Amino acid sequence: MNPEYDYLFKLLLIGDSGVGKSCLLLRFADDTYTESYISTIGVDFKIRTINLDGKIIKLQIWDTAGQERFRTITSSYYRGAHGIIVVYDVTDHVSFNNVKQWMQEIQRYACDSVTRLLVGNKCDLIEKKIVDTSTAREYADSVGIPFLETSAKSSANVEQAFMIMASEIKKLQGGIQPNNNSTYNAHVVKPTGFTPIGKKKKCSII
């Protein structure tokens, strides 16, 4: 075990281009925000270490490009992810409608029992909001995942979103299975690299 941390969790941010994935990452990792929009090319990542229930957890958070032309590149990053945050823009109904497609991507590429979270970003834009909170919550409930509305600009619920993910993953790491049929098979990560890309959809980590 690495003396600097007890767990290393790999998280993935996915969703349409322009929904604010990079801004969420910057807010959580660096506590910064910029109005400038620069589309992510391929993938980017940041690391933040947190203390949760007396355990030091290193979060490696990958920000993926939302554009279709990068799907082949980014799909490989689903494998080995412990948690995936699906982000939509509360002022853009198309981005919410596309959440179902992103969920299908998770089913196709991620391990079967990966932790998921639905996030409606830009909740500070109250006058421009067109995706009802109740509609998004109903969808999240229908697929059995948590839901939060966030604002990378005001930092509302950003910390909570990532802490929810870390907490849920840690439960699985500690052997607490929310679903008895779960095939999640993760252990404390050794600092020797990432999970190799393979055909099996099992969250084993080496």
Swiss-Prot record:
GO CC entries: endomembrane system; lipid droplet; phagophore assembly site membrane
Residue numbers carrying Cysteine methyl ester: C203
Molecular-function GO terms, alphabetical: GTP binding; GTPase activity
GO biological process, one term: intracellular protein transport
Prodomain residues: 204-206
SMART domains according to UniProt: RAB, RAN, RAS, RHO
Family: Belongs to the small GTPase superfamily. Rab family.
UniProt xrefs under NCBIfam families: small_GTP
Protein name stated in the entry: Ras-related protein Rab-1B
Organism: Dictyostelium discoideum
